Amino acid sequence: MENIGIDVKKPERTCNDPKCPFHGNLRIHGQIIVGTVVSTKMNGSIVLKRESRRLIKKYERYETKISKFHAHLPGCIDVRPGDRVKIAECRKLAKTISFVVVEKVN
């Protein structure tokens, strides 16, 4: 499958993963999130961290909020902890996984 519906580079490697949006039959829709990989210890999945800052006017300070997402990692994309990646929403793949990694961002 060539076009997955968003503007990302197709991975150079191929895989036989049916849950891959590029080489399998997984459709993506909804949110697209960019964040930092925290952990790759799960088999075929990653934990992603997204930080956002907001101003608290009363104290004239910024507050940092951290959100963690679990995402499926296809075999054709190689990531390590600390890398920035783009994930896209898909159908629920496991109890806590409803996103899939689509691109490694520099």
UniProtKB/Swiss-Prot annotation:
The keyword Ribosomal protein applies. The keyword Transferase does not apply. Keywords: Ribonucleoprotein, Ribosomal protein, RNA-binding, rRNA-binding. GO terms for molecular function: rRNA binding; structural constituent of ribosome. InterPro entries: NA-bd_OB-fold (IPR012340), Ribosomal_uS17 (IPR000266), Ribosomal_uS17_arc/euk (IPR028333), Ribosomal_uS17_archaeal (IPR019978). GO terms for cellular component: cytosolic small ribosomal subunit. GO terms for biological process: translation. It comes from the Archaea. Pfam families: Ribosomal_S17 (PF00366). CDD domains: Ribosomal_uS17. Coiled coil: none annotated. One of the primary rRNA binding proteins, it binds specifically to the 5'-end of 16S ribosomal RNA. Belongs to the universal ribosomal protein uS17 family. Part of the 30S ribosomal subunit. This is Small ribosomal subunit protein uS17.
